[in-house]
Amino acid sequence: MEITDEEKAVHYLSHIGYYRLSAYMYPLLSIPKEQHLFKQGVTFGKVMRLYRFDKKLRLLLFNEIEKIEVAVRCAIVNFGTEMTGNPFWMTDANNFSNPSKFNRSIHLIEDELNHTKEDFINHFKETYTNQYPPSWMLTEILPFGVITNIYSNIKNKKIKKRIAQSFGLQVAPFESWLTVITVTRNSCCHHARVWNRIFSIRATMPIRMSRPWITLPTDPLKVYFDMCIIKHFLDIISPNNDMLDKMNRLFATFPEVDKAALGFPSGWENEPLWQ
């Protein structure tokens, strides 16, 4: 590997760490990679550009996932409250199938309530005698993973179906896609590498798609597939979203990045989902 500015390289290594950067060096090694010899023309600058690309990709994904989180929380609260007629339905065991899962959710809810410093929660505690706040308050303080677990445990199938349908999906794929989004979100939050990662969750596919989707063979464990799921949600939540524009600008800034490493198939831009 060519290092043109040794002082700058030492600076980056001391603030980022060799182990973290090594994940971006690995794809640039010659085969067999066990020899730890870099391909011809590899520079430390190229490693850093790949690192920056991944960072900007995480920021892009997190920004789009945030919109999905807000919309999903809202749908679960609105449909759950409307169809049960109970503002406190999230903490009522009668509304859930699995008592053990419900108890775990209650434990997590209580933990959040005990540690939160949100003014609206403190105001509720001081003003009302109810043991728990209504569902629309709880969803503001609960982690997204807890919200998805609450959804998966809802007993009333009509409620689950109504929520899933509002996002153009059947119940099983909706639950699965929420899990995929949660895993991707957590990777972004924890600054994990995402650009060429092989994710562990294989998404459940709908029997039929009511909206434009992808047709080309695609690796469901690569980040491109996660991006397709994100785009599906965004097209419902915000039909005029600019996710594709952001992606194209990112790739234009880093033209050397191999899209195939992210799982992008040749001709992806012509897929119905991306039109």
What is each model feature region?
Residues H191:
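Acidic/aromatic/glycine-rich contiguous surface patches that form carbohydrate-binding/processing clefts
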Residues M1-V183, W195-Q275:
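Extended intrinsically disordered or low-complexity regions, especially N/C-terminal cytosolic tails and loops
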